[in-house]
Every structure is written in structure tokens, then in C-alpha cells.
Design a protein with these regions (language model features):
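Short, charged/polar "capping" segments at the starts of alpha-helices
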Residues: 38-41, 82-86
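Conserved active-site segments centered on acidic
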Residues: 1-66
Length: 132
């Protein structure tokens, strides 16, 4: 089984959902979660991903668990805007390989901005899929 890449953000409603979907598309073993999961995936994110042929409409945000972190060989945090719920400090204490992709949260942004975030995530996931 391939090493697991875990994508983590606060709500698991946008960035980490897109990253997991692109990772799956590019042959990575991936999962995603949030420290304070939203009720649903951001509808603008669903629309932006549909343009790439990826359907997130049935995805549900997931709560980050210690078990998820323990199973991952790499944890990618997606930038934090709310310090109290940022996953990075907690994850740093768990001695995992940790990378932060400082990306803006698509929440409340128009589709044009969400597309830019989506494309940046896809580019970073493609780079990740090429690394050993």
C-alpha cells in the first residue's frame, strides 16, 4: 500500500477536499480532514471541481482524528486563518512529516478566485505526486 498523504484544514470544506480529490486523480493514497469540520463541502468548491471533471457533491467534511494522523506518512496543512483551530501546532507535536501550503480559504469567495485556489492546489498535488 502506498504511503498515506493527509490533507488538513479547519473546515474540510474546500482546500483539503480539493487536494484529496486531485491526489486521488494523480495516483496518491490520500485522505482529508478538518479540526472543526463544516456541515457540508463549499458549493462553490463543488462547482469549481466539477469543471475539472471531479464530483465532490456527495463528500462530507470529516473530523481530524489522532488515528488519521498516525496512519499518514505526510501531513499537509492548508494554511490557517483562525489561530485557535489551526491544526498545525497540534500536528507539530505528533512528530509527523509536516508541510504547510499557505493557501487562502475559498469560503465566501467568488468562483473566479476559487478557480485560482483550485488550480494552485492541483499544481502542488502534481508536484507532490512526482516526488519520491
Amino acid at each position: 500500500m502506498k504511503d498515506l498523504v493527509l490533507f488538513v484544514c479547519v473546515g474540510n470544506a474546500g482546500r483539503s477536499q480539493m487536494a484529496e480529490a486531485f491526489a486521488d486523480r494523480h495516483g496518491l493514497n490520500a485522505s482529508s480532514a478538518g479540526t472543526v469540520p463544516s456541515a457540508k463541502v463549499n458549493p462553490v468548491v463543488v462547482e469549481a471541481m466539477k469543471e475539472k471533471g471531479i464530483d465532490l457533491s456527495s463528500n462530507k467534511p470529516k473530523m481530524l482524528t489522532t488515528e488519521m494522523v498516525n496512519q499518514a506518512s505526510l501531513v499537509v496543512t492548508m494554511g490557517c486563518s483562525v489561530e485557535e483551530v489551526c491544526p498545525r501546532p497540534m500536528l507539530s507535536r505528533m512528530q509527523k512529516k509536516l508541510v504547510d501550503w499557505d493557501l487562502p480559504d475559498p469560503k465566501g469567495k467568488p468562483i473566479a478566485e476559487v478557480r485560482k485556489i483550485r488550480d494552485e492546489i492541483e499544481n502542488r498535488v502534481m508536484e507532490l505526486s512526482k516526488s519520491p
